[in-house]
Regions:
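Transmembrane-helix boundary motif in ABC transporter permease subunits
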Residues: 89-122
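Short amphipathic alpha-helical coupling elements at transmembrane boundaries
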Residues: 55-65, 78, 82, 116-126, ...
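Membrane-spanning helices that line or support transport/gating and their immediate boundary helices
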Residues: 99-104, 163-170, 174, 213, ...
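Transmembrane alpha-helices and adjacent helix-loop boundaries
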Residues: 110-112, 127-133, 214
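Membrane-cytosol interface at the C-terminal ends of specific transmembrane alpha-helices
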Residues: 143-209, 260
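N-terminal, non-cleaved signal-anchor transmembrane helix
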Residues: 1-92, 108, 270-297
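Glycine-rich helix-loop "coupling/hinge" segments at transmembrane-helix boundaries
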Residues: 139, 214-251, 270-278
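Generic hydrophobic transmembrane alpha-helix motif, especially the helices
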Residues: 122-156
Length: 297
C-alpha cells in the first residue's frame, strides 16, 4: 500500500476573490471614459496632432547651429547664473523657515493641537504652484529676481517641512525618553536627541530641493520673475531659434552639472551619517566587551 508523502501532495492554487475580474474591467472602463472626457474637453484637433511632428522637426532644423556668440553678447550666461542665485536664495528661505515648523508638525514630539494647524499650513503652501506665488509677489516686489526667490522660498517651506516632519517621525525614540526621564525640557530633547538623528537626512533634502528649484527658477523667468526664462521667451517670440537653442543648451548643461554635484554631495552626507552611526555602535560594543574583559580579570 503506497503512502502519500508531503512531496507528492501539490497545493491547490487559490481561486481569485469573486468579482475581481468585473471590478478590474469596471475600473479600466472608468479610466477610459475619463480619458475620453478629458480629450473632448481640451478641444484637441487630431489633424493638428498629425501635423505636429513635421512642424516640430522644422523648428528643430532652424535651431541648428546654436548661436552661442550672440547669446553671450546679450548676457544670457549671466541670466542663467541669476536663475541659480534665485534657486539658492529660495532654498535657504525654505530651509530656515521649515526646520522649526517641522518640529511642531511631528506627531512624536509635538501635541496634536499644535501639529494639526502646522501640517495644514504645509499642505496649503504646497497646493499653490510657484508660478501663482510669483504672480502674487510681482506686484509687491516688481519684476525681477526677488519675486522668483520669494515664490520658490515660500513653496519650498511646504515641501521641505513635510519631508523634515517625516524624518523626525521616523527617529529612534529611545534618546528622547532617556532625556525626558532625567528631567530634560522639550528644547533639550530636540537639541540632543532629535537633531543629531535627522540633520544628515534633512540636509540631503535641502540639496535635492535646490536641484528642483534651479529648474523652477528657469520657468519663473518666463513671467518676469528673473532668471533665464525671460531670455528664452524673448528669443522664441522673435523666432530667433538659433539663439533659443543656445540658451536651452547652456541651461541644460548648468542644470545637469548642479544635479550631478548635488547628488554626489547628498550621497556622501547620507553614507557618512550611516558610517558615523555604525562606528559609534562599534565603539559602544568594543567598550562593553573591554569592560566585561576587565571585570573578568
Amino acid at each position: 500500500m503506497a503512502v502519500a508523502t508531503s512531496t507528492d501532495i501539490t497545493p491547490e492554487r487559490p481561486l481569485p476573490p469573486r468579482g475581481t475580474g468585473r471590478r478590474r474591467w469596471g475600473i479600466a472602463l472608468v479610466l477610459i471614459l475619463a480619458a475620453l472626457w478629458s480629450v473632448s474637453g481640451l478641444d484637441v484637433s487630431f489633424s493638428r496632432l498629425v501635423r505636429a511632428p513635421g512642424e516640430a522637426w522644422a523648428v528643430l532644423r532652424q535651431m541648428v547651429p546654436p548661436a552661442f556668440g550672440r547669446v553671450y553678447e546679450r548676457g544670457a550666461v549671466g541670466k542663467i547664473f541669476e536663475s541659480v542665485y534665485i534657486a539658492w536664495i529660495g532654498t535657504l528661505i525654505g530651509a530656515i523657515l521649515s526646520l522649526p515648523l517641522a518640529f511642531l508638525a511631528a506627531n512624536n514630539v509635538s501635541p496634536r493641537w499644535v501639529r494639526t494647524p502646522v501640517r495644514q499650513f504645509f499642505n496649503g503652501i504646497r497646493a499653490v504652484p510657484e508660478l501663482i506665488l510669483a504672480v502674487i509677489f510681482i506686484p509687491i516686489t516688481g519684476l525681477g529676481p526677488w519675486a522668483g526667490a520669494l515664490a520658490i522660498g515660500i513653496h519650498s517651506i511646504g515641501t521641505l517641512g513635510k519631508w523634515a516632519t517625516e524624518s523626525i517621525e521616523s527617529i529612534d525614540s529611545g534618546p528622547i525618553e532617556a532625556i525626558k526621564a532625567t528631567g530634560g525640557q522639550w528644547v533639550n530633547r530636540m537639541r540632543w536627541a532629535v537633531i543629531p538623528q535627522v540633520m544628515a537626512t534633512i540636509t540631503s533634502y535641502w540639496l535635492f530641493r535646490f536641484e528642483i528649484n534651479v529648474r523652477a527658477s528657469a520657468v519663473l523667468g518666463m513671467i518676469g520673475a528673473g532668471g533665464v526664462g525671460s531670455e528664452l521667451v524673448s528669443h522664441l517670440i522673435f523666432r530667433d531659434f538659433p539663439a533659443a537653442s543656445a540658451v536651452l543648451i547652456l541651461t541644460v548643461v548648468v542644470v545637469l552639472t548642479i544635479d550631478t554635484v548635488s547628488a554626489n554631495v547628498r550621497r556622501r552626507i547620507i553614507v557618512g551619517s550611516v558610517g558615523d552611526r555604525d562606528s559609534s555602535r562599534w565603539s559602544e560594543t568594543w567598550a562593553d566587551l573591554t569592560g566585561l574583559r576587565r571585570s573578568t580579570k
